[in-house]
Amino acid sequence: MTEQPINTKKKNGDISKAPTPQNTPASVTNSYMRSKPPTVSTIQESNNEDGTGAAAAAGGLANNPVLLSMIQGKLGDLVGKQSGYIDNLSKPVKNRVYGLKSLQLNQMKLEAQFQKELLELEKKFFAKYQPLYVKRKQIINGELEPTVEEIEEGQQLEEEEKGIDKEDGEEEEEEEEDDEEEDEQGIPGFWLTALENLSTVSETITDRDSEVLSNLIDIRMEYLSTPGFQLIFEFKPNDFFENQTLTKTYHYQAELGYSGDFVYDHADGCEIRWKSKENNVTITIERRKQRNKTTKQTRTIEKLTPTESFFNFFDPPKPPKIKSEDDDNDDKLQDKEEANDDDEGEEGDEEDEELEARLELDYQLGEEIKDRLIPRAIDWFTGDAVDFDYPELEGEGDEDEYSDEDGEGDSDDDDDDDDEAAGSQKQPPPECKQQ
């Protein structure tokens, strides 16, 4: 019988509706915004519905692709260039700038040393976690029962977190003892439930994936000798694939990034040895019959189509190769020769954006499983980690609804604002806030 995930998810507000934090200056008393309103004069726009001037300008550029290409090229050359302010500084000031660069270089060397020592410290304590993770695996799979002391400590923690009285807890415990099943071992569906409570991962899990993931008995991690880590998914014998473990390895670059952190380089997956095409949840099979017009014989044709699946996680996308300067120059020449082929350029941009999104999601999944799921697996199973994840969402849904209503009400006054004189002055706002 297929184990089903336990529904422990708790309802939360939509995170997309969370308000954007604002940084308010400590004081705006001396701000010019308080002393007087902006003095830029306004220009009364004519009510020319035809928009003849703008349309004529746009039409002129559209009919002159050479001029349009020249303008775009000039604007593109300006991107990323400095204004020249540093070059025009006096020599003594430049020397001070060089001195600050030297100080920053020494600071970055210390940051690199800090990150390397921090990684070694993480590895040291990770080794101390291992006996606890081994015992967790044994309890989940029914190989070991927790001690009386561990049960009492866990009950006390739950009572403190949820504010349960001891007497009420004892009554609930008696009811649970009456419903106990002696044949049930371990915690069924533990890792499937924990994964489905982790929102980023749950979005990649399909119904077919759930049946496979119900055979998952452990998720663990190992550090590499080089910067990076490996995720290990262990399964009990099942009808889907022959592998006992599936691995995903993340590699970082040897050199630290500008911010002083390790920079992601690439990821390696593993080959899943599916027992049959029907059990491969990463594809869909479409079968149709064809009849030969001459011999009248029929044959069955199969079409295998890749489909969305959590198990695509073990076949990660490959980042694009870094191009050399010679390759960039060749690309520029090729771009000039193919300037009129806009459709192919747009398709290439879309493919690059899609690849970038896939790489970002793949890295995010690995980091969340490593940093959030494995250390706090029991909280993701019970759903408690969901509340710790987004505590600020509680009670903010109504505020968003009221703000939407205010926005609709303000639209009624738009016509009145348009009738005001262009030169009239308005009082400055009482406070300036920056987003």
UniProtKB/Swiss-Prot annotation:
Biased composition, class Acidic residues, residue ranges: 146-185, 338-355, 386-421
Pfam families: NAP
Record field: compositional bias (Basic and acidic residues): 356-374
Residue numbers of Phosphothreonine PTMs: 20, 24, 29, 42, 52
Subcellular location: Bud neck; Bud tip
Biased composition (Polar residues): 19-50
Chief subcellular location: other
UniProt superkingdom: Eukaryota
Post-translational modification (record): Phosphorylation is cell cycle dependent and is important for its bud neck localization. Phosphorylation is highest in newly collected G1 cells, declines when the cells are traversing through the G1 phase, and reaches the lowest level around the time of bud emergence. Phosphorylation increases and remains high through the rest of the cell cycle until the beginning of the next one, when it decreases again. Phosphorylation involves two septin ring-associated kinases, CLA4 and GIN4, and its dephosphorylation occurs at the septin ring in a manner dependent on the phosphatases PP2A and CDC14.
Subunit structure, interactors included: Component of the GIN4 complex which forms a ring at the bud neck.
Protein name: Nucleosome assembly protein 1
